[in-house]
Swiss-Prot record:
The UniProt record lists the keyword Translocase: no
UniProt similarity note: Belongs to the bacterial ribosomal protein bL12 family.
Membrane-crossing residue ranges in chain numbering: none
GO terms for biological process, alphabetical: translation
Keyword tags: Ribonucleoprotein, Ribosomal protein
SUBUNIT field: Homodimer. Part of the ribosomal stalk of the 50S ribosomal subunit. Forms a multimeric L10(L12)X complex, where L10 forms an elongated spine to which 2 to 4 L12 dimers bind in a sequential fashion. Binds GTP-bound translation factors.
Keyword Protein transport: no
Disulfide bonds: none
Function summary: Forms part of the ribosomal stalk which helps the ribosome interact with GTP-bound translation factors. Is thus essential for accurate translation.
InterPro entries, A to Z: Ribosomal_bL12, Ribosomal_bL12_C, Ribosomal_bL12_C/ClpS-like, Ribosomal_bL12_oligo, Ribosomal_bL12_oligo_N_sf
Name of the protein this chain belongs to: Large ribosomal subunit protein bL12
GO MF assignments: mRNA binding; structural constituent of ribosome
Amino acid sequence: MALSKEELIEAIENMTVLELSELVKALEERFGVSATAVAAAPAAAGAAGAEAAAAEEEKTEFDVILQDAGAKKIQVIKEVRAATGLGLKEAKALVDEAPNPVKEGLPKEEAEALKAKLEEAGATVELK
């Protein structure tokens, strides 16, 4: 059963950023093409294109930075271990030496979820 153009557009409108990214990758692989912009007018689009690409990257990938462990340091260490898979010694060192990145390059949803877990455990967390 084929989708009409309107149904396809509607389906794309309802996708998350992560789902759209996966769709683009799948289309690139299936058709052997690249979704990078064609440099038809490099002088006009050079700086603006680079700034737009940087802004888009900032919006899709976040670093979770532990600023302070707070009073419940043991709970924060447990959450760091659960999120990163680090051993007890490594997780304790990461928490003791704050500010430190807990995880980097996360999609917005995952970064916000991790931030919420760490803050619930008593930590002060920043997304960059």
